[in-house]
Amino acid sequence: MSYQFPDNLNYADTHEYVLEEEGLLKIGVSEFAIDQLGDIVFVELADQGATLEKGETFGTIESVKAVEEVYLPFSGEIVSVNESVIDNPELLQNDPIGEGWLVILKPESKVSIADLMTSEEYKSKVMPN
């Protein structure tokens, strides 16, 4: 399979992507990681308004193969939750980088996106050949 690694995304070691938009962070899971999970059957996400610390779990993704937790790459308040993904988990599988985003985070302080991997660095990690 051919995966997308858009240049405007940065990635955490745990396969979450971050898109910085006007001081907010749109967070989802990479196309590569979603493909590894197989058919997604259930998505659970933290509540809007929840304040979480970097590294804390903000949700779980259940597939026919496994249940995986998703982690925040930065501390902050969840200001939006993608209810569409909860109602229709296939969105996450079919379009993880577009309609399948998970949450929008208002970081508690200025974040350095450079602390995360660039698209090229992430691609080299998950597809070393």
Curated annotation (Swiss-Prot):
A Gene Ontology biological process term: glycine decarboxylation via glycine cleavage system
Keywords from UniProt, A to Z, are: Lipoyl
One GO cellular component this record assigns the protein to is: cytosol
Q: Does the keyword Transferase apply?
A: no
* Highest taxon in the source lineage: Bacteria
Q: Which InterPro entries match?
A: 2-oxoA_DH_lipoyl-BS, Biotin_lipoyl, GCV_H, GCV_H/Fam206, GCV_H_sub, Single_hybrid_motif
Family the UniProt entry places it in:
Belongs to the GcvH family.
What name has this protein been given in UniProt? Glycine cleavage system H protein
Q: Which organism is it from?
A: Prochlorococcus marinus (strain MIT 9312)
